Amino acid sequence: MAVAVVTSRRMINIGNSIRRCFILNHRFFSTELTPTTITPINQDHLLRVCTILYQQQNSPDSRLVSKLSSTKFQLTHEFFLQVCNNFPLSWRPVHRFFLYSQTHHPDFTHTSTTSNKMLAIIGNSRNMDLFWELAQEIGKRGLVNDKTFRIVLKTLASARELKKCVNYFHLMNGFGYLYNVETMNRGVETLCKEKLVEEAKFVFIKLKEFIKPDEITYRTMIQGFCDVGDLIEAAKLWNLMMDEGFDVDIEAGKKIMETLLKKNQFDEASKVFYVMVSKRGGDLDGGFYRVMIDWLCKNGRIDMARKVFDEMRERGVYVDNLTWASLIYGLLVKRRVVEAYGLVEGVENPDISIYHGLIKGLVKIKRASEATEVFRKMIQRGCEPIMHTYLMLLQGHLGRRGRKGPDPLVNFDTIFVGGMIKAGKRLETTKYIERTLKRGLEVPRFDYSKFLHYYSNEEGVVMFEEMAKKLREVSLFDLADIFQRYGEKMTTRERRRDRDQLLKT
């Protein structure tokens, strides 16, 4: 009797968890798929089938088949996908349901979508033997597509089954999926996005005699090695690409130059830059020049940035607002304010990037009031500020209070100091912080982003209005305007609801 009670309680808990997971997945698919592609399914049947698969996943086949057959569910592709979504990391329930669908529903035929879904789950659970067996079976059935190649290569490469990655291309070629450079490029791209660049290079080299790589192959590999910071391999591929007779690729050169600049290797980056200008100068766009100009401006080399900028304009390359903003910021950091404002006046259609360059530069040189004036003009001209705008202005006026620190004592001090301030004991709080600094512990940094986020509600609207009044009373008009503007334009759920009702009426 006690066993029966425990079993029933366990079934209830399992059912509730599966029901919650099912409802979430049902909502997800209802928003992703169009009404014309969704086949209505019985939710009770789905819950019952998932419960049986979970409880009977280790039971004999006869018992599992008996339980599933008693449900009388209608097996469709949507039903199979919903079952798979309830077991994202459990291969056994999904695989056993797949076998059941093959033996007891002969009219049901799997598609590439259902096969890929099941294959991805088995791969995520790291059952490599079953995964490899099913990957070959799907190829024999003619259900392989580009997504199948991506799933197989990603899973095998993650498990360091590199020979199988190459063999998969050979097997698929035998099944009628001929060697194709586009398919290989998509596979290499998938591996590079997962930071599996060494594995991608292995596949690339082994398949080179069967599939001739193109410009996209080399570009993807170069970008992948740059993303992981391996510039030596990226340079080797760059040279190999040149030896193969390909033109200098703009995107690959831009990525190498950008990575070198991130590592502050300016001399090497400038060599790449001038090689690109000499060989592909007529095809370079503003984004290529902007990478160099932006780095030079941020590192105080404004005169060199102006030379690159002038060369860019001589070649007739269009100058976008992001490039203008970089130059404006670079001039302001060097306190060449008049020149910076002269550039602003020369911009035909200034957008938020121009104003951000101005505000950021003025804040950098401790001109927060002037930055706030730019903020006001920005609003007058119809350019709506974003969260980053408010954060820059608040840091300019209030500074970065404290520093970030993982020390647990910092968290204790945060709570303790906050409680002292709420209690009105400001003098005691100040003395405590002074003692804290003397003992060598840093005060935690005040996070303006979290502050604005936490008060993005109706209570925050009232609070910002009151804050603006108090700040004006003590002649802090700039801060008052910033907080008042944020409170007025802040979008809350209640305001959206009221606005929708007004539009309906």
Curated annotation (Swiss-Prot):
InterPro entries: Pentatricopeptide_rpt (IPR002885), PPR-containing_protein (IPR050667), TPR-like_helical_dom_sf (IPR011990). Keywords: Repeat. It holds the Pfam family PPR_1. It comes from the Eukaryota. PPR repeats lie at residues 145-179, 180-210, 214-248, 249-279, 285-319, 320-350, 351-385. Belongs to the PPR family. P subfamily. This is Putative pentatricopeptide repeat-containing protein At1g26500.
